[in-house]
Amino acid sequence: MTINDSVISEQGMCEEEQVARIAWFYYHDGLTQSEISDRLGLTRLKVSRLLEKGHQSGIIRVQINSRFEGCLEYETQLCRQFSLQHVRVIPGLADADVGGRLGIGAAHMLMSLLQPQQMLAIGFGEATMNTLQRLSGFISSQQIRLVTLSGGVGSYMTGIGQLNAACSVNIIPAPLRASSADIAHTLKNENCVKDVLLAAQAADVAIVGIGAVSQQDDATIIRSGYISQGEQLMIGRKGAVGDILGYFFDAKGDVVTDIKIHNELIGLPLSALKTIPVRVGVAGGENKAEAIAAAMKGGYINALVTDQDTAAAILRS
């Protein structure tokens, strides 16, 4: 959901101003939603929906000032063990939407890292799109420029489609994977593709998801149809434990050689990704622990957002 500029005739305010006023009354003045609805002449349902919209767009940010917020012990250990610049570990919660909660945590981290008019490079995947959905208001207000790290326009639309129309987004106009290495080479040398790849490498901050070979059918790269189950089995037999942007690496963090898809991908290679100053990985699930650890060992990410159980599994591995 995004905050639009529709004017509410009773108050003469745009929707974003309504959200800001409701948030102030609710969080600072301690008014109930019923009291706010009476004061503004809105239904209680409308007040509730605008509060939710404010959270999802990033206009409303909740900050918990406690040393326990973010599972400090895990964050400290991960920073020390993997030389990370930034870590956010969200507390575990049974039966919760882990992907959505990781998106909130990653959005908060990015809002603290990005400066006005900086460039954010984004990778494909559920975790990164969950994050983007919660950044709409922030991206618009801070004039953050967005650029994709890979081809595959459809893979980005669940996040980009939620952004304000005024947001600056530069998308690689090509598929994630070409049908052959020759076609991939040709596409990457087209100016319209090359220019976006150069812009992505010049980004101030990047955010990427991390896939695990152990996920099998649940892996985004399989569900999206970029590799087959048979290919994944062969990749696993070559020692791969995880991937970022479709590039597979082993438990030490080294890119696995002699994998067909690597020559057919249209996107920023991991060696170029490492030149971006801040590289945030967002991933959760104990089955991803080995892949996340390998991504940190390889230096592909230097910041991490994960959940408590996954953090514990990483530190045990």
UniProtKB/Swiss-Prot annotation:
Q: List, in alphabetical order, the Gene Ontology terms for molecular function in this entry.
A: carbohydrate binding; DNA binding
Q: Which InterPro entries match?
A: NagB/RpiA_transferase-like, SorC_transcr_regulators, Sugar-bd_dom_put, WH-like_DNA-bd_sf
Q: Which domain of life is it from?
A: Bacteria
Q: Which residues bind DNA?
A: 33-56
Q: Which Pfam families match?
A: Sugar-bind
- Its chief place of residence is cytoplasm
**Location of this chain's protein in the cell:** Cytoplasm
List the record's Gene Ontology CC terms alphabetically: cytoplasm
Alphabetical keyword list? Cytoplasm, DNA-binding, Repressor, Transcription, Transcription regulation
Signal peptide, first to last residue: none
Q: How is its activity regulated?
A: Inactivated by phosphorylated autoinducer-2 (phospho-AI-2). Phospho-AI-2 acts by binding to LsrR, which is then unable to bind to the promoter regions, allowing the transcription of the target genes.
Q: Which cysteines are joined by disulfide bonds?
A: none
* Transmembrane spans: none
Function of this protein? Transcriptional regulator that represses the expression of the lsr operon in the absence of the quorum-sensing signaling molecule autoinducer 2 (AI-2). It also represses the expression of the lsrRK operon. Acts by binding directly to the lsrA and lsrR promoter regions. In the presence of phosphorylated autoinducer-2 (phospho-AI-2), LsrR is inactivated, leading to the transcription of the genes.
The entry's family comment says:
Belongs to the SorC transcriptional regulatory family.
Task: Please state what the protein is called.
Answer: Transcriptional regulator LsrR
Q: Which organism is it from?
A: Escherichia coli (strain SMS-3-5 / SECEC)
